[in-house]
Amino acid sequence: MIDSVRIRHQGSMDFLSHYEYLCALQDSVPIPAVKANIRHGSLSFNADRIKLSDWLPILNSLKINKSLLNVSIKSCHQPGLGEFGAEKYGIYFKRRIPPIRSKDMTFQVCKAITSCLSVSGSLKELELHGLPLRERDLRILAKGLAASSSVESLSLAYCSCGDEGLEIICQSVKNSPTIKTVNFTGCNLTWRGAEHIASIIKHQATRRHSEAWAESLRYRRPDLDCMAGLRRVTLNSNTLVGDRGAIALAEVIGEDLWLKALDLRQCGISNEGAQAFLNAFQTNTTLIILDIRRNPLIDRSLLKTIIERVLMNAHDTNSEYKWYTSPSSKDNGKVRQKWRSINNWNGRKGKNIVRVGFSTKKPMVIGRKYSSKELYCPDPRPPGAEGFLPWRTAERAKRHRDVSGEWASPGKADTAVKVIMDSETSSESEKSDNILSILDQEYAVPGSGEKKSVKNYKCLQLEFENTRLRQINHTLSESLHSRTATSVILEDEGVLDSIEKSFSKFHAFLDLLKDAGLGQLANLAGIDQSDFALPGDPQMSSTIDKIAQQAPMPHQDQQETFFIHQAQSRDKKGEHTGPSESNALTADTLPSSREADKYCTTSQKSKEGFDPDLKAREANVNSGRLPALENAQTYLYDKKGSRNECSASDSSRSQRSSLGQKSKASASEKERKPSSKRSHSSGTNKASQESIAARDEKAAARSNASISESEIQEKMNSSESMHSGSH
């Protein structure tokens, strides 16, 4: 590869190395201002400080470069102004005009920029500030903008291109797929230039509407932010735009969905143009910045209304487009004070002070009546006189008392005179600038929330959590203190309800026994029929009395049941007991009361299960028990005739038991019939049933004999004990 081609190829990717190489070829020193920001991908310098011989390496390096991100060339030269201090010395000379102000140099700069735009795919921002661009320069620059595929921001501020030059640039901007921001501040534009901008916005809106329709097919949602076109237009400091240009722009932005910011400061807009913008916001919801400040013909109330509407569109979102800030009034107030010595009013030359600056004290108004305190000014006294106070001491005392000493009365020799020239400290433009700062606090302009520190947010979270815990603690303490006797009463009522429910369940159980034909168990337990009433009025007194009177009865029944089941078990095993064996059973062989109770409960459960065989056996036992009890009663009357009272009570007791046994027998016969039907339906043999019945009859006869003898023996023992107790 040829060396020149290799160097050119390397220079396209490294501006600094190629620039230094070209400077070395022409034996010149690289300018430090040019190399200052190259490392950051930015070429930014003041063109007024560049000599004609130094422009050639810069332009040749810029033509072939493909790596720069930002190109900014500025010129701040003000033609027609003499050097400072020329009047003082009486010397008048013309300032040296920098080479950038010539038409040949501006044309060469525009050609180099056009070449860079054509070959570069990384250049994003192009700024030409204060260059006197002619029509020829703008035409060649428009070709580069049309060929560019990467530039997004174009700024031609203070380039004095006019309406004709703007029309040339607009032809390239209209069809550019990448340019989003244009800045034509101070370009001597009129309402015609505003119409050119409006035509660009309208043309791009029509094209983007068609693209949005195409992307919305098949139920898709078009992304408006990704579409090409202008997003911000800046036309500040073009005083000839006026209301006509403002109305042309307002008509376009009313239907636009893509423009985000429009800057029109110092454009000669009055209330008519401002009202047109306010009407446009009835349909526009995407414009988040409309800067019409510094237009003194707009009322403050109308300006505030428009800015409020703009901030409502912003929705406190963090946008990439920000409001341009104006210089604060504090910076404007910092004016250098000039001091010089003049003759005092008495004709003597003394130390007098003249201060030219801004006064914090209001000036004296002619025709206004002031109080004696405001007009009081003591006469100065000569040195050495009583009450003399040096002026320096007086000034220090006034400063300590925060009293401004702008006005001092004229005095004699060696006295200081301070003269203050007041000027207005506020203007209509500054008032309009302050509106945005006030509204920022009320509506939170986008980006202001980012300045809040994370520590404050965490502190707020902790305070909120502490408040919530305090409220919970307070609620719990109040609930503990509010517990009174009523809650205890309610708890007692709950206990009573549970007891009542248990009684109702018990009475329901007794009703089930009665419905099942097992009411005799309740009679044996000593529970009267009156106890089967509703649980609302429990009648347990009769039950308690009968249990006290008939205490030995349950034990006796348990013994009888024990003998019955013992006899049945013997029959099942095939053992045959005679009368002698049954007589041999005495009180020593009887089971204990605990075993009898346990056996009684098991027998009751078997009865609740409706066992037909067991009920049949009980019926046989009860039928055989009746003659035995009658014989025992006759025997007791014959043997103990003298004891009529005891025998009478025994006979009545035996009669009651006999009646109970008869009822049991009748109930068992009724229950035996359905049981026999069920046995026939199940398919059992008649022979097995007859053998079981014969076996049951034999067991019942044996148990009746044993029970009758045991009952007779027990009744004799009880009668003897009662007789001995009476004696």
Curated annotation (Swiss-Prot):
Compositionally biased region (Low complexity): 647-666
Main localization (coarse): cytoplasm
GO annotations of cellular component type: centriole; centrosome; ciliary basal body; cytoplasm
Single GO BP term: cilium organization
Biased composition, class Polar residues, residue ranges: 579-592, 703-727
Region (Disordered) residue spans: 567-613, 636-727
Keyword vocabulary terms for this entry: Cell projection, Cilium, Cilium biogenesis/degradation, Cytoplasm, Cytoskeleton
Compositionally skewed regions (Basic and acidic residues) per UniProt: 568-578
Cell compartment(s), UniProt: Cytoplasm, Cytoskeleton, Microtubule organizing center, Centrosome; Cytoplasm, Cytoskeleton, Microtubule organizing center, Centrosome, Centriole; Cytoplasm, Cytoskeleton, Cilium basal body
Family to which this protein belongs: Belongs to the CEP78 family.
PANTHER family cross-referenced by the UniProt entry: CENTROSOMAL PROTEIN OF 78 KDA
Protein name, as recorded: Centrosomal protein of 78 kDa
